[in-house]
From Swiss-Prot:
Protein's recorded name: Nucleotidyltransferase lcsQ
EC numbers on record: 2.7.7.-
Compartment annotation: Mitochondrion
Induction remarks: Expression is positively regulated by the leucinostatins biosynthesis cluster-specific transcription regulator lcsF.
Key word Transit peptide present: yes
One Pfam assignment: PolyA_pol
Function: Nucleotidyltransferase; part of the gene cluster that mediates the biosynthesis of the lipopeptide antibiotics leucinostatins that show extensive biological activities, including antimalarial, antiviral, antibacterial, antifungal, and antitumor activities, as well as phytotoxic. The function of lcsQ within the leucinostatins biosynthesis has not been identified yet.
Span of chain positions assigned to the transit peptide in the UniProt entry: 1-22
Organism: Purpureocillium lilacinum
The UniProt record lists the keyword Transit peptide: yes
């Protein structure tokens, strides 16, 4: 079952789906891709292939195995090679020996003088061998050997087949054939092999024609595939958004099946959910993949989670029965708004002012993801503990194991949302007190000190405000400048509405909404309080106490705030004596034990 979309969103989705089906048709002709049976190896890859084949011959000659060793490079490396994407990570699949055993024999072989000479092995070409123990909670179902050779990161593992229990995503593993190994994988495009002995690509599941069609499909029945391992649902979303592929409709129809959603909620560790979500929200397309503004990989990933009804299986506390679920009907406004804002990186734009660094952009996408939870309060009658996290931060911590730094920003965004919104509205209405530099600057310092990233707290408030004020977020309106994404307005925006008079009503509403927030941020910049949290104090607590002739105490923090407010009112002053005098005059209010 898919979401019922508004007519405007349905039209946009048809455009986007059509675009994703046809993107890259020039760089990778479907006919050529469907019949591609070889790949072009780099010099380092050719060197590695020759070495590995020599190791196979030495093992076969020793008679340690019952059948000849056959090596295949598997999965993502093959997919990326066929797409023209460079990859330095190679999974090596072995037919008749464990990965650990083969890797040890290979490392021993690389110490032989003849091998060193024949393959040009330098003193730093072979790294240390690391055996990674079986760890099902982290999707390591077999012991794996890892080593770096010729600058390439190799993982060695045997071909296998899997058997799943109903109540676990951790399979029983046995040696298997190449076809059985391919069938157990999450998608046909990840089930391709490059046979080192024949030099050909082996396709047991139809992965080559699926790549030609830019399609993601499961090798086996999708319901069984996802029930066995519900993490595959999230992996397919990630691959579709990163590679700009679309998900096969038959596969897509099963992704929100109640059995799959329940398995995703309770059968899979939340750490693994967090890993996949982090990869989605940090998602970038490879340089070879052309990305249209509509199809930003992170925005597209959230859109797929939305359309496939996966939200409540991810952003949830699986240990508790849900007592309240946020309204998702306008969630699309939040992530579409953020994608639109980040598409305009011109100086002074909202996206530039509120998310300056790569880390800030990642946090911003997390905030967009949890926007439906941001205004949710604890149910009435629930006894709150001191410093208890709000529901949005609890969901992030328990649902996808968000780190403390991230939950702190979410909690602060929740607590300061109304205050931020009130200040923004006051600025837009021209309230005289908003011209007071100390009031605005101290508010910003307080937000930043209680969770950090005050700019991202403002961005979170903006996204929630967008969900509440705007019915839809038009992605395409009118052409922008060549240097800007289509439909991104110039910044700063005029506060007047004349620009929007002849536009579609939804576009006019969007532009008016952005105008208000741009006006607020322009005001912050004009007051020169954007960097208020990093302003250096003219004196610290010890110096203030010494000037007052008392010991530091509980009063110190409030008194230092008085000094900082004075600094904000007097930005050109470098002598703190008048600030100290103001503290002295307010000693009773501040609780300072002075004699006179």
């Amino acid at each position: 079952m898919l979401l019922r979309l508004s007519p405007s969103r349905m039209a946009l989705k048809r455009k986007l789906d059509s675009f994703l089906r046809n993107v890259h048709s020039q760089s990778a002709p479907p006919a050529a891709m469907a019949h591609a049976r070889t790949v072009r190896l780099s010099a380092r890859e050719e060197q590695l292939r020759a070495l590995l084949l020599d190791v196979c011959r030495s093992i076969d000659a020793a008679g340690d195995v019952t059948q000849p060793i056959i090596l295949r490079w598997a999965g993502g490396w093959v997919r990326d090679k066929l797409l023209g994407i460079e990859s330095h990570d190679i999974d090596v699949a072995i037919n008749a020996m464990t990965g650990v055993h083969f890797a040890q024999r290979m490392c021993d072989f690389c110490t032989l003088p003849d091998a060193i000479k024949r393959h040009g092995i330098g003193p730093r070409d072979v790294g240390n061998l690391h055996n990674v123990a079986r760890n099902p909670d982290k999707s390591k179902h077999l012991e794996t050997a890892m080593v770096k050779i010729f600058g390439l990161d190799l993982d060695f593992v045997n071909l296998r087949r899997e058997t799943y229990a109903d109540d676990s995503r951790n399979p029983a593993m046995e040696f298997g054939s190449a076809e059985e190994d391919a069938l157990r994988r999450d998608a046909t495009i990840n089930a391709l092999f490059f046979n080192l002995h024949t030099g050909c690509v082996e396709d047991f599941t139809g992965g080559l024609p699926d790549m030609a069609a830019r399609m993601i499909r499961t090798p086996l029945d999708p319901l069984q595939t996802f029930t066995d391992d519900p993490l595959r649902v999230l992996r397919l979303v990630r691959f579709a958004s990163r590679l700009q592929f679309y998900i096969d409709p038959a596969t897509q129809r099963v992704m929100d099946h109640p059995t799959v959603l329940q398995a995703l909620r309770v059968k899979i560790s939340r750490e693994r959910v967090g890993v996949e979500l982090e990869k989605m929200l940090k998602g970038t397309c490879p340089p070879q993949v052309e990305v249209h503004f509509w199809a930003q990989p992170t925005r597209r990933a959230l859109e797929l989670l939305d359309e496939l009804h996966l939200y409540h299986a991810i952003f949830t506390d699986p240990a508790r029965e849900p007592t309240e679920r946020p309204d998702l009907r306008r969630w699309h406004v939040a992530y579409e708004c953020l994608g639109w804002l980040l598409g305009n990186r011109s100086p002074g734009s909202i996206g530039t002012l509120l998310a300056q660094s790569e880390e800030a952009v990642y946090v911003a996408w997390n905030l967009a993801a949890v926007s439906p939870w941001m205004p949710v309060e604890e149910p009435p009658g629930v006894k709150k503990k001191a410093n208890a996290l709000p529901p949005v931060a609890v969901i992030a911590r328990e649902g996808f194991r968000a780190p403390n730094k991230l939950t702190d920003v979410m909690a602060a965004s929740h607590r300061h949302r109304k205050e931020i919104l009130q200040l923004k509205e006051a600025v837009c209405h021209g309230e005289p007190w908003t011209r007071q530099r100390d009031r605005c600057g101290m508010a910003i310092r307080r937000w930043d000190s209680q969770g950090g990233f005050w700019t991202l707290q403002v961005l979170s408030t903006l996204l929630v405000d967008a969900m509440e004020q705007v019915d839809s977020w038009p992605i395409v309106a009118h052409p922008g400048k060549p240097s800007q994404p289509a439909d991104v307005p110039e910044t700063p925006l005029s506060s007047g509405a004349s620009k929007s008079k002849n536009l579609d009503p939804s576009i006019a509403k969007r532009d008016d909404f952005i105008t208000g927030w741009q006006k607020f941020l322009d005001h912050v910049v004009e007051l020169n309080v954007y960097n208020a949290p990093t302003m250096k104090r003219l004196l610290d607590g010890r110096a203030l106490a010494q000037a007052l002739g008392v010991k530091p105490g509980k009063w110190t923090g409030k008194a230092l705030d008085v000094c900082m407010a004075w600094q904000l009112r007097n930005p050109d002053e470098t002598d703190p004596s008048k600030a100290i005098e103001e503290v002295r005059m307010r000693r009773d209010e501040l609780g300072i034990p002075l004699d006179g």
